[in-house]
Amino acid sequence: MTFYLNCPYLCCVNDKQTKEDSVMLDTKIQKELTNDEYRAIQGWSSTQIKSVVKHSVRKALIPIADSDALRMGRAFHTVMESVEAFDRDYAVFDDTEIVFSIQRERPNISVPSMTKEYKQARKQFEQENQGKEIVSLDDFNTLLMMRENAFSNPQVEAIMQSADKTYVEQSYRKSVHIDSHQASVLVKARPDLIVHMGNSSYKMIDWKSCRDASPKGFRSDFFKYRYDVQAVVYCDVVGIDPRDFLFVALEKEAPYLCAVYGMTDEVIEVASRDYENALVSIARYENEMDEGGLTKDIVWI
């Protein structure tokens, strides 16, 4: 069973619907891109488009500052790609021995990581692993638990067993024509996973780390962060039916539970309308018809 997100309630339906089997992947960028290379290429990302939906074009143009949460998010998506990819890009700092040594010699130390010895050990480890991101052993164990629970979920397991080909972290780009303004907006997408099923249909899977993967908890995140808009952007750029887009919600805290969610037609319709309106705003901004800010009119709340 797969949960389908609706407003204002959740329904649970059998995942055996008649859907379009044909799909075009003509927008795929053939060159393999790293995350940094993808961010550098031209095109409006789903993150920026969501920002336009929630606020304005000018808000979407402000670069997002890096943070611990974003770094952990990148590590999460890398380990979901593959353990080999994680080993390539990350090094795990196991501080068990240095912490034990510090506490044995100075039992009154409450925060060993603030000591000179700890910082020296950390610095040496970073020097030995230049070019890699560093994650703690605790974070690494959490990531492995999340990955294990994702791929042992019966829905995910069934999809992967039916797959005859997978596209992992591939980059796509599409020029979307805006009829009302005789203009085009370049949009890009980098889905976590696209699975080609044996029956010639596709599933697009998006890994979502969260604190609460229950229907009530995930629904809150879903609409707060406009995951629906992200989904329709990805599906439009790649050429996949949004009903074949699945969110795999993974708790990043114990008990690390996992649930799979899809979107109802009503949710897709609202998200598609918001996406189209955002593209119009972007087109107006790019053609200097609008400064990309908030409305100058009075808005009655």
Q: What residue spans do the PLM features occupy?
A:
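Metal-dependent nuclease catalytic cores that hydrolyze phosphodiester bonds in DNA/RNA
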Residues: 5-8, 12-189, 296-299
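Charged/polar, low-hydrophobicity segments characteristic of intrinsically disordered regions
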Residues: 108-115, 264-277
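Mg2+/Mn2+-dependent nuclease catalytic core
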Residues: 168-273
